[in-house]
Swiss-Prot record:
Family listed: Belongs to the TRAFAC class TrmE-Era-EngA-EngB-Septin-like GTPase superfamily. EngA (Der) GTPase family.
Organism for this UniProt entry: Bordetella petrii (strain ATCC BAA-461 / DSM 12804 / CCUG 43448)
Lineage: Bacteria, Pseudomonadati, Pseudomonadota, Betaproteobacteria, Burkholderiales
Name of the coding gene: der
Biological process according to GO: ribosome biogenesis
Binding residue positions for GTP 1: 11-18, 58-62, 122-125
Entry-linked CDD domains: EngA1, EngA2
All copies of domain EngA-type G, residue ranges: 5-170, 186-359
Residues noted as binding GTP 2 in the record, renumbered to the chain: 192-199, 239-243, 304-307
Protein name, per record: GTPase Der
Length: 451
């Protein structure tokens, strides 16, 4: 199995990195826009241009606010992302021209060892190609390509060039839950920021015998997959760059890589998100959790180092979790001590349940009955003089489950009512641990019909 390619957007502030990021990822972001509490300031996302899927990172999210030199502003994670990405898109500003910061970043890129850098000259709309790009040749990074992130000009060609020879055919769709054999392995990614205890938990899961290492993958874009078994259930651990080889076995070490984390999330069936009970829920925690939600992966939360807290501290971390990660309210949450091996069995039980929920089959008759019962108890609000009418529902996909609702005047269903229906479907089908997406399809334009 190979990971999706990763595109890192690099450039000084205000050259349009966020605009390009939003254009590349907007179709995916729209799927989860209604989740309460989900940060709008996204740094990681799933992108697609035509039939080409990829992961995109806006490295601007890693830059401190400090007004020091541009190289000092670029955090360690930015430099790591530059080195580990499959391709770097270096954005410059056609209207501002080349400046000293651009030269410093170009020098950093040359020293990084990154072999694939595409120079994108943004804000080139209304300018001739020569006028927009000529002076950027002096950066020494090859041909500059004019684009307009705001208007979408040149984006398809830019990404096609960036991902040339990197794109592989998309994998076959995952099988239905009913078609999965009893010994089907759950692909599990354990993610979390540095020093949260991932390595301790992984070593506990792998057990005293460890696991025999087969041939290591040949390239960094291949996933390292480690099979293990607990309580008769088979799992495949997808590495997040925290495993090292010792002889013929792998041992987990505490290491963090944004790119490897995002790729492992993409490749998994279930994500185990680890938080540190002894530190605050960070922006990075929230961004990683948001990416999990965007990809539609089932998720279980484990709050580690719980054993060292008093009652007041435990109440504080629970309040903070509910406030900062309330968009993960569907995810089972456990408190554990990875070091002492406490609370691990319930976590894995939730992983199994979340996996089953992600691949659950939802029958059309039961979905429709539950829909009608929900509408009878709480009808959807009117849009002007029109009352939405929901006729029937059916399943449109799995991993995550997608429910498609058909009817009239459904174009303006508010997010609050969507969440109400989600709650009803979750309770009816026991869909704990998986995102649930709802799509409305109107049979006719509600503004051309009588109420």
């Amino acid at each position: 199995m190979s990971f999706k390619p990763v595109v890192a957007l690099v450039g000084r502030p205000n050259v349009g990195k966020s605009t390009l990021f939003n254009r590349l990822t907007r179709s995916r972001a729209a799927l989860v826009a209604d989740y309460s509490g989900l940060t709008r300031d996204r740094h990681y996302g799933e992108g697609r241009v035509g039939d080409t899927p990829f992961i995109v990172i806006d490295t601007g999210g890693f830059e401190p606010v400090a007004k020091t030199g541009i190289l000092r502003e670029m955090a360690r994670q930015t430099r790591q992302a530059i080195a580990e990405a499959d391709v770097v898109v270096f954005l410059v500003d056609a209207r501002a021209g080349v400046n000293a910061h651009d030269h410093e970043i170009a020098q950093l890129l040359r020293k990084s060892g990154q072999q694939r850098v595409v120079l994108a000259v943004n804000k080139a709309e209304g300018m001739g190609v020569g006028n927009a790009t000529s002076e950027f040749h002096e950066l020494g990074l090859g041909t500059p390509y004019p684009i307009s992130a705001a208007h979408g000009d040149g984006i398809v060609d830019l990404i096609g060039l960036a991902l040339q020879d990197l794109v592989e055919p998309e994998p076959e769709p995952a099988p239905d839950a009913a078609d999965l054999p009893p010994d089907h392995r759950i692909k599990l990614a354990i993610v979390g920021r540095p020093n949260v205890g991932k390595s301790t938990l992984i070593n506990t899961l792998l057990g005293e015998e460890r696991v025999i290492a087969f041939d290591l993958p040949g390239t960094t874009r291949d996933a390292i997959e480690i099979d293990f078994e607990r309580d008769g259930r088979k799992y495949t651990l997808i590495d997040t760059a925290g495993l090292r080889r010792r002889g013929k076995v792998f041992e987990a070490v505490e290491k963090f890589s944004v790119i490897k984390t995002l790729q492992a999330i993409e490749a998994s069936n279930v994500v185990l998100l680890m938080l540190d009970a002894q530190t605050e829920v960070s922006e990075q925690d929230a961004h990683i959790a948001g990416f999990v939600l965007e990809t539609g992966r089932a998720v279980v939360v484990a709050i580690n180092k719980w054993d060292g807290l008093d009652i007041d501290q435990r109440e504080r971390i629970e309040r903070e979790f509910r406030r900062k990660l309330r968009f993960l309210s569907f995810a089972p949450t456990h408190t554990i001590s990875a070091l002492k091996g406490q609370g691990i069995k319930p976590v894995l039980k939730s992983v199994v349940a979340a996996h089953a929920a992600a691949f659950a089959k939802l029958s059309t008759p039961k979905l429709t009955r539950e829909l009608h019962a929900a509408v009878e108890q709480q009808p959807p609000p009117r849009k002007g003089i029109f009352r939405p009418k929901m006729r029937y529902a059916h399943q449109g996909g799995q991993n995550p489950p997608l429910v498609i609702i058909h009817g009239n005047a459904l174009d303006a269903i508010p997010d609050s009512y969507r969440r109400y229906l989600e709650t009803r479907f979750r309770e009816a089908f026991k869909l704990d641990g998986t995102p649930l997406r709802i799509e409305f399809k109107s049979s006719r334009n509600p503004y051309t019909q009588e109420s």
